[in-house]
């Protein structure tokens, strides 16, 4: 198999790791929501989150494909009402995250500082099967597979800005007006 083309490239190739998978036999809509939920998370936090989803301690919030999705209290954590626990999609994405961490170790990057910056799920070609119906008819049985690509980049730890020592305390305009009147 040849080189995989990604839809986006990381800004710093030396500090980034990539992984992808094609023609996965998991539901496109569920996998889309799983990847959307882990985007922007630290690699270790994403793994911990997905393991909690498998244990049904936390849910995947459904934001785009919300038709006939049940409501759960676990989705309130994300400001949503609808959520699910798509175990098969979560296990596939966990495998890709394990691949990311193995790639990071091969590049000798610190996995604790890796942040998932890009995740994309595309529809794959429909898998065609058939089912036999009454009176000699045949109907299609299609499955909606997907392609997934993810990359993570090592991010330096944020340094907090020190507050200036002699900075005057800012007073809001409403407070200034009350002080001027003498109330």
Curated annotation (Swiss-Prot):
Q: Single GO cellular component annotation?
A: cytosolic large ribosomal subunit
Give UniProt keywords alphabetically: Ribonucleoprotein, Ribosomal protein
Q: Which GO terms describe its biological process?
A: cytoplasmic translation
Which Pfam families does the record cross-reference, listed alphabetically? Ribosomal_L22
- One GO molecular-function annotation for this sequence? structural constituent of ribosome
Instruction: Tell me the superkingdom of the source.
Output: Eukaryota
The similarity comment for this entry is: Belongs to the universal ribosomal protein uL22 family.
Protein's UniProt name: Large ribosomal subunit protein uL22
